[in-house]
Amino acid sequence: MPEEAETFAFQAEIAQLMSLIINTFYSNKEIFLRELISNASDALDKIRYESLTDPSKLDSGKELYIKLIPNKTAGTLTIIDTGIGMTKSDLVNNLGTIAKSGTKAFMEALQAGADISMIGQFGVGFYSAYLVADKVTVTSKNNDDEQYVWESSAGGSFTVRADNSEPLGRGTKIVLFIKEDQTDYLEESKIKEIVNKHSQFIGYPIKLLVEKEREKEVSDDEDDEKKEGDEKKEMDTDEPKIEDVGEDEDADKKDKDAKKKKTIKEKYTEDEELNKTKPIWTRNPDDISQEEYGEFYKSLTNDWEDHLAVKHFSVEGQLEFRALLFIPRRTPFDLFENQKKRNNIKLYVRRVFIMDNCEDLIPEYLNFIKGVVD
């Protein structure tokens, strides 16, 4: 018997923000996945940090990962993490009744023409789920509480109830019920493209449940049964039959040979890790070999040649950042095209991709330099 659900009203500013997200047309809706993966990564950071002083915190699940499960039949996209999880009060407060300080600021920025992709910087990235979903459920289990489910179709209210279904162990499972006109976000290729663009350097494995096909050899038993049935029918008829024993033996032999091998195609699912390239800019330059720099450069730029030079440094103080910059071996063919949009340096914040057209990062005369700033 399902537990009774409590209904809560969204805090006024949050309800306003959700209405704005749902009723305004935004072209880059794909950022919803970046935000949810980023939140999952934060939750994993928290449990890992707690486990440093108390290893027993990981008794509820040692493996730290993020998993994506598209289901075209049900029209859902599920995002699971084995992070710290949320208590009942976390679900009520964080997802609806207490407005983050950035809620109002973000709405004002949106109305002034800011890009929806800035949503995460204001601490309200979760609500970007409603760019592509008309209903969202969040199942969560924290070590200090029972398992609860938060649910909302964004109509000004949400429900929270105890959950006795499949136990998570620890962590959070978000199920997005995808809008009918957004089902391309259930395609494996689309999910891979978004993760590769925005979340390639998240510090935990991001696994995608993919459907694959393999060839399988089976014995042709069904054909046997069918043949036996046909023979029985023939025996039941009264007409006499002349048999050639030699021919029969040959036919039997051929039948057996054919029966031995029949190849069928079988579908199966398995987890595929999407973010195997690790963010080497977070490591100490002394520990990184030239081969590793070379591999990273090629994966970043799709250049087939090695780089000419590399500079890897960090700045600490009021403003903190790490930079890994490469000079390519060859001059770009469009070096002197002034109108071309520059996107050679990717800007990340805490390993999450933000933009690749930040013109203030480097002067125009150095626009051939490639790399990352985090």
Curated annotation (Swiss-Prot):
GO molecular function, one term: ATP binding
Main location: cytoplasm
Gene3D superfamilies: 3.30.230.80, Histidine kinase-like ATPase, C-terminal domain
Organism domain of life: Eukaryota
Gene Ontology cellular component list: centrosome; endoplasmic reticulum chaperone complex; perinuclear region of cytoplasm; polytene chromosome interband; protein folding chaperone complex
Biological process, per Gene Ontology: centrosome cycle; cold acclimation; membrane bending; multivesicular body fusion to apical plasma membrane; negative regulation of cell population proliferation; pole plasm mRNA localization; positive regulation of insulin receptor signaling pathway; positive regulation of neuroblast proliferation
Ranges of compositional bias, category Basic and acidic residues: 226-244
UniProt: ATP binding residues: 39, 81, 100, 126
PROSITE patterns per record: HSP90
Coiled coil stretches, renumbered: none
Subcellular location: Cytoplasm
Sequence similarity: Belongs to the heat shock protein 90 family.
Complex and partners: Homodimer. Interacts with shu.
Known role: Molecular chaperone that promotes the maturation, structural maintenance and proper regulation of specific target proteins involved for instance in cell cycle control and signal transduction. Undergoes a functional cycle that is linked to its ATPase activity. This cycle probably induces conformational changes in the client proteins, thereby causing their activation. Interacts dynamically with various co-chaperones that modulate its substrate recognition, ATPase cycle and chaperone function. Required for piRNA biogenesis by facilitating loading of piRNAs into PIWI proteins.
This protein's name: Heat shock protein 83
Originating organism: Drosophila virilis
Gene name for this UniProt entry: Hsp83
